[in-house]
Amino acid sequence: MNFNHEELMLMMLYNTGTRLGLIHELRLMQCYLMPDETALRVLSEGVIEKLKLLTDAEFAELEFPPD
């Protein structure tokens, strides 16, 4: 699965160490988005959909950009 730089940065910010934990945190974050924050909602939805297609082993192999 290919993630772009923006997606990887979002994942890095909310990463709990597990794929399902990250999905949960992204869903939780979406609850706090304002109606005009559509770009972040679209970005996070795309990341969640891609994460659903990964296995936990594939997620563990992901490399996040350095801080």
Which sequence ranges carry the predicted segments?
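N-terminal acidic leader/helix
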Residues: 1-25
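Generic structural signal of hydrophobic/aromatic residues within well-ordered alpha-helices
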Residues: 22, 26, 44-47
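Short, charge-rich amphipathic interface segments used for partner binding and complex assembly
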Residues: 35-62
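Charged, terminal alpha-helix-loop-beta segments
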Residues: 65
